[in-house]
């Protein structure tokens, strides 16, 4: 029996969602042999872009490292603002096992990537989730506490807040990078039938796990295009299906950011019908792997 091909997904998030030229240059930097571009999107209000690539472990690791370097070159956090919390120009870089590879191996990839990022670009890294160096860093929100502005001071003054690789301080303009390994998650944004962001924040507090809400759910309330939005990460869609989250929130519309595993997609469900502009061949991971995007020229 021939060995199963190893496929790793990486979904880096960058703190730039308003300058398409910068984002395209970052995407171009990820064009590495053995790596396929599956998706990328920009959000003006969050001032954030999300890129999804998949391929061989070594190729994906190299693509991620190059992307962080290009982001550090192009993005200056000292003048950057947006709705989304962030600590770095390349804010989070998660490695996700897709086929023929274990989560623990992805954690090793993450640690290798963090070391290489520091070696090449002097951008420090914090390891989170399965790659975390200690229990209190498993949660991304704990790593990102204080955001760039607060962490750049805390990392120097408080030894417990220093990066896992590099430092002790952050990169002056590019901050730090949270590099980790995790399983699939569903990035799901729900728009409420109101312009009151306070309502979205209340709903987010009620549904997120840290507030005693739903298992494996992270949420925050923001204002996007004049509409209140509950921005969610469903980190365990088997324990808490997307439909259950939808059932707790009165939605005007919704969107999926990045790709969604086929196992999480229920096309006949009410929540699925609320998704704006959903094309299965473009948004379901297994289908997109068959027909990846062309790299930007």
Name each model feature, range by range.
Residues 2-297:
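Long, contiguous binding/interaction regions
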